Structure formats: C-alpha cells, structure tokens
C-alpha cells in the first residue's frame, strides 16, 4: 500500500536556539589519522564539534597539526556563538593535533581553565596489535 504524500509546508524547521552557557568542556580526540574536537556543556551535552576531515582535509593531510588547528577554530567559533567563554580541555589520544588544537582554542579568546590528558591506558588488559613494519 502506498503512503500518502507528505506536505512539505506542514514540516517546520526550527531555528537553532542560542544558548547562553559560559563554561564548557572541549574534548579533543587526536588519533594518528584524524582529530575530532567536541565542545560540550558541563553535563556533556554537545554544543559544537568539528573534525579535520570535515574541514576538507583528506588522506594524510587530515593528521597534520594545521588541520587540527582549523578544526578547533571552527568548533570554537560555533561554541562562542552559544556563549562559551571558559573551557576545560580534555585531550585523548597520541595524535599530532593535540597541542595545536589547544593553541587554536586559546587564540580565539576563550579562557582555558585546565588541560587534562584522559588517554586510556590499559592495566595490561587486551593483547595489543602486531608491531608495524615499515
């Protein structure tokens, strides 16, 4: 049975509401292949996010510090529009975009209250992958 056509005029696209949140948390996930920056409020609700790949960098250029800097600037500007002024930064992963993303957030005028490394370290859990031979 065919469904009745949906009237597009009946659908409403709500305008993005500007929240006024002063404090937040910047989660920087820096892997060897990409860097993802997510800015949340204190409860963990995402306000903005950006990644190196989402900014047009492809392949090995995604994993550069410059790509991480561009992604951090995009996420930071979107968070500033939501009212963010102070950030706690949590960095996870060993990638090359760790430091440059924090510098980019600071250069936007956002006050960095603390920087913490939350990279998960096993207490001798799972067996690691085989060693790379290049």
UniProtKB/Swiss-Prot annotation:
Annotated InterPro entries: Ribosomal_uS11, Ribosomal_uS11_bac-type, Ribosomal_uS11_CS, Ribosomal_uS11_sf
Keyword Methyltransferase: no
Cellular component aspect of the GO annotation: ribonucleoprotein complex; ribosome
Superkingdom to which the source organism belongs: Bacteria
Entry's Gene Ontology molecular function annotations: rRNA binding; structural constituent of ribosome
PROSITE patterns from the UniProt entry: RIBOSOMAL_S11
Pfam families on file: Ribosomal_S11
Keywords, in A-Z order: Ribonucleoprotein, Ribosomal protein, RNA-binding, rRNA-binding
Gene Ontology annotations of biological process type: translation
Coiled-coil region: none
Self-association and partners: Part of the 30S ribosomal subunit. Interacts with proteins S7 and S18. Binds to IF-3.
NCBIfam families found in the cross-reference section: PRK05309.1, uS11_bact
Family: Belongs to the universal ribosomal protein uS11 family.
Protein's name in the database: Small ribosomal subunit protein uS11
Organism this protein belongs to: Leptothrix cholodnii (strain ATCC 51168 / LMG 8142 / SP-6)
Source organism phylogeny: Bacteria, Pseudomonadati, Pseudomonadota, Betaproteobacteria, Burkholderiales
């Amino acid at each position: 049975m065919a469904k009745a056509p949906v009237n597009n005029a009946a659908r409403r696209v709500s305008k993005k509401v500007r929240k006024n949140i002063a404090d937040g948390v910047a989660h920087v996930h820096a892997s060897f292949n990409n860097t993802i920056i997510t800015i949340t409020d204190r409860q963990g609700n995402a306000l903005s996010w950006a990644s190196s790949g989402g900014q047009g960098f492809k392949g090995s250029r995604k994993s550069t510090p410059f790509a991480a800097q561009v992604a951090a600037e995009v996420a930071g500007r979107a968070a500033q529009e939501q009212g963010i002024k102070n950030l706690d930064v949590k960095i996870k992963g060993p990638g090359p975009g760790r430091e440059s993303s924090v510098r980019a957030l600071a250069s936007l005028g956002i006050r960095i209250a603390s920087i913490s490394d939350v990279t998960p370290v096993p207490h001798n859990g799972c067996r690691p992958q085989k060693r790379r031979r290049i």
